[in-house]
Amino acid sequence: MKLKLALLAGAAPAAALYGAPRPVQIIPSVLPADFAALGLDCTALEKAGCDRIQFDVMDGNFVPNLTFGPDVIAAQRKTTKLMFETQLMVSERCTDAMLPQFTEATKGPNGEPGVVIVHVEACTHIHRSLSNIRAMGGSPSVALNPSTPAEAVENVLDLVDHVLVMTVNPGFGGQAYIPTMTDKIEKIRKWIVDRGLDVDIEVDGCVKIKSSRRLRAESLRRPPRHRRDACSMAWRYRFLTVRPRRRREMTW
């Protein structure tokens, strides 16, 4: 089974981070799903109890793969009431030109802000891109590749709701977790906690039971268990701790 896991550690007080295990969300990526039955798959995910659906958008330029555009994402709104999350793994020209369409397509069933993730490597003016997402009614979030230092996002932490740390090179599944990314995650988490920001950290890429142990130990004390019953297909899962205000809670 292919897994795409993310551990999300919000900027709660330090005592909460190091204390009892925090609740988690399960957010599957539909990248490995059957595109011919994507709507049925999204409906199945909602019935399985998932909290949000993640779409990996690739343009064949920024990463060596090609997936779907905003119309495909928007069409899935008819099949589920779950919130969406869109990660734009696309070139700068595509990011700037398509932000309005993707932000609109990612919104919830009642116009709630959907999570729109842009890569810091693809945005010369990252402040402007993130501010535009917020102004257009989205939830601005930033991602950084393994080769990008944590300092690249330090000056935009006050503009985002999430920071996504890629622990493999984006584009294809089946890659090994890069161990040095754990230190990067810890550095970003420390900045968030020290500043008292309400920002979550997502960890994306081959986060399996072994690699998750250290991540959970540093931010949540305990590693997550593997949820095999959430979906029968070889979809990639995201395990995220959530902020206390969110509706569903599960402890691990």
Regions found by a protein language model. Name each.
Residues 38, 45, 56, 102, ...:
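Conserved, mostly hydrophobic/aromatic
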Residues 24-29, 53-55, 76, 84-88, ...:
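Hydrophobic faces of well-ordered beta-strands that scaffold small-molecule active sites
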